[in-house]
Amino acid sequence: TKNYAKKIKNQYIEHLSLNKSINKKSVKILSDYFDHIFDLGESLFKSIIKLYNKDITSSKEVFKRLKTLSTLRFNYYANQTRPVEVSKQDGVALGCETHVDSGIFTILYQDKKGGLQVQNRKNKKWYNVPFNKKALVVNTGRALEFLTKGKFKATNHRVLWNKKKRMSIPFFFEPSYDFRMSKSFLNGSNSKNDGLIYEKFLNQSLKKFIEYQR
């Protein structure tokens, strides 16, 4: 957010001049929302740390605020005249391809049109995620699956094709770009610097997305 971005010069930190396009009140709302949703993500991660009987302050090692790659997006989907993909599994028309996210959590607010589906890994069936104006959807990501050695699986999800325009607001809660993705972080007595930094882990993960393979 603005206050944090001003404190450091780094290629991974970007602060857009929102004041030029929207009013100051809206900028503050966006900045506050980012701060609160970031805190929520860290609280969720701390609850996982507790399962491994580790000190919850170790989360600060993962999510250094000035270095985090966490991203808040406003995804606007205009009227889709045709689906982006037809599922090979069940022939369903999709507005967003089947995938898992790269980070720790994706904390999502979806609009009334919905369309989000998640997959049960055991029976491979798809289930609708209903809209609830008082709730946020939390998907687990590939980074969390890696750090927990598969205990928390990345959520396989997709979005059904809808001819009507819609909007979703996902917050991708991700580690600092230089955090070492070591499986010993949660599973060992000490955190070892024997893994890829998250930047490289993310690059490898993104290459698995269909968009990067076209």
Residue ranges and their predicted role:
Residues 1-214:
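Peripheral, non-catalytic segments flanking oxidoreductase cores
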